[in-house]
């Protein structure tokens, strides 16, 4: 048994790393325009930074399993736009993609993650509530799983080599939460604005995506990146996420007040008077 393990270790290879290492970028920028091209998203700095961060997270997880990366790229809106197809083609090999992660309390959830690089959480995001969002946030924060596979005698730590994408046809999928929604990076899709549908010519779409990975690899090799948003982009994200939360006028007033509040503590009476504009004796 030990001899087999030694021989297997000596002959190990990583197909995803091999794929990424074999890419040569042609120098043409694609990350900035990809989501607009296939899904009609805005080709702005936010969309560029969101997709770039997701790609670099996926690359980092392949080369440095278990590295800290908590971000989920969430594609929102546009039923039939090709959101799930985008994640599938992004994984390059269909075997490296799965959308079979339906429940986080499934005892087989970790086995379903094995061998996959891009994992789409579609139903969980679409039906999320405050409680399930907390579970997803906790799940995204993990850097490893500990479990036993068949024929193993003891559980082992398995560092994550995957990233998670989300998709939702519902706009207000994020609960009102000032503290933890930073993990969710929503990008609105507008299929009627897309240059092409991603499945119109799958061969061309795959070639485009391959070169986008090559561009991301050029950034990765440069070392000039971080696996998180800049402070400026984080502020933009916080404001942008409001568009994907349930409409609640009073909650919005309170959130706006708290965002500009500079004190160390706040009480309910203060919110009642200053955020909502009431008098104490009303």
How should these model regions be labeled?
Residues 133-156:
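Conserved catalytic/switch belt of AAA+ P-loop NTPases
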Residues 174-195:
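A short helix-turn-beta junction within AAA+ P-loop NTPase domains corresponding to the substrate/partner-engaging
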Residues 119-122, 148, 161-169, 186-187:
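Structural recognition of the conserved hydrophobic beta-strand(s) that form the central parallel beta-sheet
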